Amino acid sequence: MGYYLVTGVAGFIGWRVGEFLLKEGKAVLGVDNLNDAYDVTLKYWRLNELKKSENFKFYQIDITNFQALKTIFETYSISAVIHLAARAGVRASLENPWVYVDSNITGTLNLLELMKDFGVKKLVLASTSSIYAGQSPPFHEDLKVDTPLSPYAATKKGAELLSYTYHHLYGLDISVVRYFTVYGPAGRPDMSIFRFIKWIYEEKPIKIFGDGTQARDFTYIDDIARGTIASLKPLGYEIINLGGGKNPISINQIIEILERLIGKKAKREYLNFHKADVKVTWADISKAKKLLNWEPEISIEEGLKRTVNWSKENIELIKSIKV
């Protein structure tokens, strides 16, 4: 039985994709460099959840290390690669763009080269809705996205282009999935919902960039994991949006729902809107429905309820994590 190689397996999406594959009886080979882009405490928590399965193997490897990655391909039979390892975050990419180029472009190139050399034909490549900055929503996959507003978006676009080249030259079957604002239990502590929940519990001001009317197409983690795994089917080369697909919800509305679920009022601190951010994200998911028979099942109300319930069950973990 071949392994499904999941890069960035200790990350939010990597962890949940790994869990879903393991529940399906698949063997999962996970790699992650466990970098400190955000508090690693949560990465270790996710890894410990995955290690409960005998079908899970983990290696602490940086995908920019070609030789270390090559050893994985030499040692294991790999059925497909789900490439989720990346430096993420719009604002952070302005502070250290070099690490974004290394991880998101060089790391992706290393995987593509090894897939070519070892005859691994299927890649699911994680991309981002940040690529659509400056376009009019709802965003569909055919929009021209050649004007990224951040190094993060630029490097993810670069990874998409590299993957197309390897599809064209070497026949790799590649599904590029563009994620829209993923949230849920054990989510990234550098993302809004985790921070909002933590700050409400701790009665600290919630920092909001802009007036809070900016809106996001929030997508629950389980829906994202399902869509990612569905993208393993043979498609040739396709770019597919995975998002909520309905009217986006504002940051102010998210805070109001969290206040109700937690039972505490938030303190709000409004800051200047960041010029690398976008005002609205909104996915056209008609392509995902057609090609993957996929659409989100979890509403924003239900998803936030599950997220808050998880936070209550893991309150000491939440409090220990630095944001």
Swiss-Prot record:
Report the EC code(s) recorded for this entry.
5.1.3.6
The residues the record assigns to binding NAD(+) are 11-13, 156
Catalytic residues at: 152
The top EC class, named as a word, is: isomerase
Cofactor dependence:
NAD(+)
Give the UniProt keywords, A-Z: Isomerase, NAD
MF annotations from Gene Ontology: UDP-glucuronate 4-epimerase activity
Return the InterPro entries for the record.
Answer: NAD(P)-bd_dom, NAD(P)-bd_dom_sf
The reaction(s) this protein catalyses: UDP-alpha-D-glucuronate = UDP-alpha-D-galacturonate
Family to which this protein belongs: Belongs to the NAD(P)-dependent epimerase/dehydratase family.
Q: What does this protein do?
A: Catalyzes the interconversion of UDP-D-glucuronic acid (UDP-GlcA) and UDP-D-galacturonic acid (UDP-GalA).
Protein's recorded name: UDP-glucuronate 4-epimerase
Protein species of origin: Thermodesulfobacterium geofontis (strain OPF15)
